[in-house]
Swiss-Prot record:
Pfam families from the UniProt entry: Anticodon_3, tRNA-synt_1g, tRNA_bind
Residues where Zn(2+) binds: C147, C150, C160, C163
Family: Belongs to the class-I aminoacyl-tRNA synthetase family. MetG type 1 subfamily.
Cofactor note: Binds 1 zinc ion per subunit.
Gene designation per UniProt: metG
Biological classification of the source: Bacteria, Pseudomonadati, Chlorobiota, Chlorobiia, Chlorobiales
Record-listed E.C. numbers: 6.1.1.10
Protein name: Methionine--tRNA ligase
Source species of the chain: Chlorobaculum tepidum (strain ATCC 49652 / DSM 12025 / NBRC 103806 / TLS) (Chlorobium tepidum)
Subcellular location: Cytoplasm
Amino acid sequence: MTHIPKRTLVTTALPYANGPVHLGHLAGVYLPADIYVRYKRLCGHDVIHIGGSDEHGVPITITADKEGISPQEVVDRYHTMNAEAFAKCGISFDYYGRTSGPVHHQTAREFFLEIEKKGIFVKKTEKQFFDPKAGRFLSDRYITGTCPVCKTPGANGDQCEQCGTHLSPTELIDPKSKLSDATPELRETLHWYFPLGRYQKQLEAFVERHTGDWRSNVVNYSRTWLNQGLADRAITRDLAWGISLPLDSEEAKGKVLYVWFDAVLGYISFTKEWAEKQGDAELWRRYWQDPETRIINFIGKDNVVFHTLMFPAILMAWNEGRSEGRYELADNVPASEFMNFEGRKFSKSRNYAVYLGEFLERFPADTLRYSIAMNYPENKDTDFSWSDFQNRTNGELADTLGNFIKRSIDFTNSRFGGQVPADIDLEAWDSLGIDWLASFGKLEAAYDGFHFREATAQTMEIARFANRFLTESEPWKVIKVDPEAAGRTMAVSLNLCHTLALLFWPIVPETANRIWKMLGFEGTIDELVEPGNPVWRQALEPGLKKGHKLLGSSEILFSKIEDKDIEPEMKKIEALLAEAEQREAAKQPVPMTFKPEITFDDFQKIDLRVAKVVACEPVKKANKLLKLQLQVGSEQRQVLSGIAQYFTPEQMVGKNVVLVANLADRTMRGELSQGMILTVEGADGRLFLLEPQGEGINGNSVS
């Protein structure tokens, strides 16, 4: 017999508070977790659903720098935005926390100090880029330069967006600091490392213990890392935004916890905050430190090793040498594959996405929940398309479920006074043609095995059966010759409505509650579910007795989606795909068309010199022009250049440029220009400077 734990803790990967969540996030993590939690609640289980925002890390500080605001303002904005979008979508968190909060900071520091006290961390000195102007060390994403592979300028220190190559900052050609545009210097810095290899054997045993119940992708990702051997992993960074190290030593100054270490601890700190709101500050321990709790971590496949290796290793380090206050490890880590969008991967950086909040401004949440549940990326990547969304809403939700519910209630209201016209005994219920015990057994197995697409499809199949039953029974005809038979048909139909309301509640909760209300019940299904009350089993049997009074009115559960409703979205896709094609074309070699041939003597007439920009200012009433004061050896020149759209005056000062020194003077916008500086035009039309490097080259010839 399967052991049923006393309680279940469900956590969801923390979305990064640096932008809005999109449908890919919803499909991979938050909707499946919510469906599972709602199912468990229906079964009467003690289950809590914990989520929240990951609010630390470099991308947040970069966004803050770009917008001229504080990191706290960035995370405040996106935490609120995402929390509201989740609530509107019916994602039923028991608590949605923030890693920037005091309880989380305290929890993360407690873990650090406990592991530090045991002497587990390893300290290492390494070389890292340092911005001499800004006076701070730079993380990968604060460094930009030319990609060594495709030679595209503007590559980040961790990856080139143009060719996709993963990089380290030291590989960049001509690296620059994004903070000051200064050339960074390699300097030594000290960091704390977590020795993952110390727990290699324990982690191998942990993964192997779950090979029979974890998804194959989770096991395979974990084994790949284990087979390579687990290395030490840095847990600190030189950064101003984050959780500062709780040490007074000089070497700890300016260090914060690396986000991979602190974010997963949010599951624990958020459970603590939830417990405080329940009036019992120690209640969280029952969900984290009791073997009678089953812990489920819902994540996407890109987060697997953080939850199967790194987070467990942190908990193992805490537990080491302890007999009390030991943390339990996850029972399952149902990691999904990715959901793509119209054949391509979701991409925030390229704005190729459908954001949850924006979607819900146009379409009901339940239509999205159903469409994604039927396309859940369990074992392979799936694709969200507007046409599939339209077809499922119209053909399955509106024409099948919605049609059956409305016909059943409308006919009862009009011909039977809005009351259930007959009692349905179990014999009649079981003779409908559905093996209820077998059907429920399959549904329970699907939910318990995290097969949400299968569970959704089976539930819709019961709706199809109900719709066929009503259509084939033709009570609108039978009532003319046998009112009692028509009454029995409607009693069966109404009880099927009752069953469907309960079965669909995990998938489309708002719709289920609307059906519940039309059936004449007070309150909502949400108010029925509580530990120890197995509402789920009520769907097995007829739940409406003869004489039960319906609400007396019905409503259309789902409006059909017309072509004109999704046409604007399709046009957006066309525009985004056109942009993508342009980017792809930019990667291809540019066809060369050369100017007419000149002789070597002609070329020798051009005098190219290295000049340094000593001052720069905009040209009045000229949006494209900058006025540069150049030092060319012992001479000073004034040059006007059409680069104002790509460089600020502040960025230009101090740069070396290539000057055409013997170009005839000319006047532009009333200003004298004594030459021209050389630039290169990129595929997107952006201009890049030619910047000679080296000491003592000012005024020298370029050849």
